[in-house]
Amino acid sequence: GFEVTFGGGRIDRVDIMEDQNKVYVKVIDYKTGNTSFDLVYLYHGLQLQLMIYLDGALRVEQKKYPDKEIIPAGVFYYNIKDPMIQEKIDADVEAVSAGLMKELKMNGLVQADPELVYRMDSSLGSIPVAFNKDGSFRKNSSVADRTQFAVLGRYVRTKIEKIRSSILEGDAEVSPYELGKKNACTYCPYMTVCGFDRRL
């Protein structure tokens, strides 16, 4: 894996896997918090970063390999904090190791191609995918096919353009999002000066 810079942005890690006529691109964003990839947040424009990074990485790789098909392999958040595992003092090494692997598992979206999934992680220990006995993806697997990745990419580009236009038009309305129990004010450094009453 390597770091990639594009158009003013910096991607923490990009892994590529090259075939005869294809290049698969995987993007990893390191986080110190407990960030989870969520399509609802992406839809509302609150979690565009990974897909923006993927779009940038795909463009960079297309320039490097103009004669090859560039395919998204996956986008992931990886928690870089040292995990704390609660085990009894006499717990066996395998139980502790399994607990660590569970805590270190990346979350995100994976290309729905079983062969590619096994090439990325033959143990399936680090990516959010599991298989049924018949070889199909389990219901809780976080997968998208190539068409779905393309649709998400187009949606994010459109969303960015709408946000950009809104900013250029001077839209500075104080209207923080609220999804479930989360809202934009929770970690906002400007909450004491913006004038928004969170009790409304």
Task: Identify the residue ranges that each predicted region occupies.
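Structural signature of nuclease core domains in nucleic-acid processing machines
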Residues: G1-L200
